[in-house]
Amino acid sequence: MFKISRKNYSDLYGITTGDSVRLGDTNLWVKVEKDLTTYGEESVFGGGKTLREGMGMNSTMKLDDKLGNAEVMDLVITNALILDYTGIYKADIGIKNGKIASIGKSGNPHLTDGVDMVVGISTEVSAGEGKIYTAGGLDTHVHWLEPEIVPVALDGGITTVIAGGTGMNDGTKATTVSPGKFWVKSALQAADGLPINAGFLAKGQGMEDPIFEQIVAGACGLKIHEDWGATGNAIDLALTVAEKTDVAVAIHTDTLNEAGFVEHTIAAMKGRTIHAYHTEGAGGGHAPDILESVKYAHILPASTNPTIPYTVNTIAEHLDMLMVCHHLNPKVPEDVAFADSRIRSQTIAAEDLLHDMGAISIMSSDTLAMGRIGEVVTRSWQMAHKMKAQFGALKGDSEFNDNNRVKRYVAKYTINPAIAHGIDSYVGSIEVGKLADIVAWEPKFFGAKPYYVVKMGVIARCVAGDPNASIPTCEPVIMRDQFGTYGRSLTSTSVSFVSKIGLENGIKEEYKLEKELLPVKNCRSINKKSMKWNSATPNLEVDPQTFDAAVDYNDLENWLEQPAAELAKKLKKTANGKYVLDAEPLTEAPLAQRYFLF
């Protein structure tokens, strides 16, 4: 038997079972749990390599031929290290007709046993050795303000947005709402020319009939926002329509507590599922205790990224940002007080810990309205780094193995937002049958800058050099548009998400859309238990005087490797026996200046 050192093997084929790799310049490591390729039969493209005619490439099978369950792929990514909520493992990825068709071993079944997908005459190959592959990310809090957010999103690893808006109107600068048929149609028509998956939220304030007609127009969900009025009646009616049409409802609650307090908002929901935006509250919501919504099973809590992670600069940047985003006047004392009420260091500090406990399930941006669309992925991993640095390993993790923490955090911007908006059967993970929206990363750039972004099997954005060079690696090497962003390729490699009733009513033909429209589904049958790796419901209370966020002792158990008793000694204990969730602000972040000086 031929033997090879792990170092030599990883140099040739990428790391394998039992090996670990560091994620960017963070303190996080992932350990390969399994390898679905076959030692000695690895698929490798290139001169003198295995994927040649008569060897690893089959020369006789046509595109629609099958041998057992194995069929010829359009694209095979070889020896990929998959980082997904489903696991951290190595495999070949087969893509066909824009979808993930196989995960396992590629090759020529006429020569090799155990082949799951065929490399044939019709197959292109992408060399995945030494790279990490994640599902395209989702951002479910996008203000539809300008089209240039799309390449920024793609360059940050985001391939799907749930958005709302009308362009640079003041309503959209504050709220993610495409109100009424005209604006839903306009948004879908604009998305037809952009290389990203998109769905749009309509206004969730009003009586049932005008809300319903927006869903018929194709809105994939509803948004309740305090700037339009987040009253108990609005919440009840929006959820009533959503229950009838199977769409999601997102909410930005009442900061000023004008129509009631957090308990009144919770009561108006009547146990019906709702996606709570920026649950900490700096982005908006009942001051100071909207964070308490993490304890309810019917609320799917999310964060927006300006408060993530908590750093020494977080508080300082928020006041002016908030004044601009919500059309406030710094000369009006009441407006200044409104802004001040939303920025609380205590709840911002607690937010990171609640993410690490799995109590906040989703990450998003709030792009151009107190958030950055290109930093959803980056800030998620900065927060994971911060939590490991300050609190140690997550339960079940060990040296060079942060797999549990990594799965928790990757789920926050992939599968969980997809579940929340009824699109998890299409996107959100690397699983057979889903759209082939995949992001490749060099490990040293993981979480900061992708190597390429694939949309439904076609590269949309990629690191590429001077177009006039003799080889593709000559400087300047930057992210550039690829063929997936042009012509009919653009409309055939992205989709738009709409309501089922809108699709059935023929909006594709009426609006003259070229992209495939896919209906959202199962939006009303989910709850927090549906959130992968992030379903904790701690009994959190926010002190209205000190703004301290505290949980019970049992909420600290089964979180970290360090015993709950040891952690409890480090946390402040309240008069009623709870433990305050607090952490120091980060003074130096990974995935930051080292990657973005130029």
UniProtKB/Swiss-Prot annotation:
Print the keywords alphabetically.
Cytoplasm, Hydrolase, Metal-binding, Nickel
* Cofactor(s) recorded in Swiss-Prot or TrEMBL: Ni cation
What is the active site of this protein?
326 (proton donor)
Q: Which organism is it from?
A: Ureaplasma urealyticum (Ureaplasma urealyticum biotype 2)
Q: Could you name the Gene Ontology cellular component terms for this entry?
A: cytoplasm
- Residues reported to bind substrate: 225
Q: PANTHER family recorded for this chain?
A: UREASE
- Stored CDD domains: Urease_alpha (cd00375)
Residues reported in the UniProt entry to bind Ni(2+) 2 = 223, 252, 278
Name this protein carries in UniProt: Urease subunit alpha
Q: Where is the Urease domain?
A: 136-598
Q: Which positions does the record annotate as the modified residue N6-carboxylysine?
A: 223
Instruction: Name its GO BP terms in alphabetical order.
Output: urea catabolic process
UniProt pathway annotation: Nitrogen metabolism; urea degradation; CO(2) and NH(3) from urea (urease route): step 1/1
What gene, per UniProt, encodes this protein?
ureC
Return the similarity comment: Belongs to the metallo-dependent hydrolases superfamily. Urease alpha subunit family.
Q: What is its EC number?
A: 3.5.1.5
GO terms (molecular function) for this protein are: nickel cation binding; urease activity
* Chief location: cytoplasm
Summarize what the UniProt record says about post-translational modification.
Answer: Carboxylation allows a single lysine to coordinate two nickel ions.
State the oligomer form and interacting partners: Heterotrimer of UreA (gamma), UreB (beta) and UreC (alpha) subunits. Three heterotrimers associate to form the active enzyme.
Cofactor note as given: Binds 2 nickel ions per subunit.
Task: State a single Pfam family of this protein.
Answer: Amidohydro_1
- The residues the entry assigns to the signal sequence are none
Q: Where in the cell is it found?
A: Cytoplasm
Reaction(s) catalysed (UniProt annotation)? urea + 2 H2O + H(+) = hydrogencarbonate + 2 NH4(+)
Q: Where does Ni(2+) 1 bind?
A: 141, 143, 223, 366
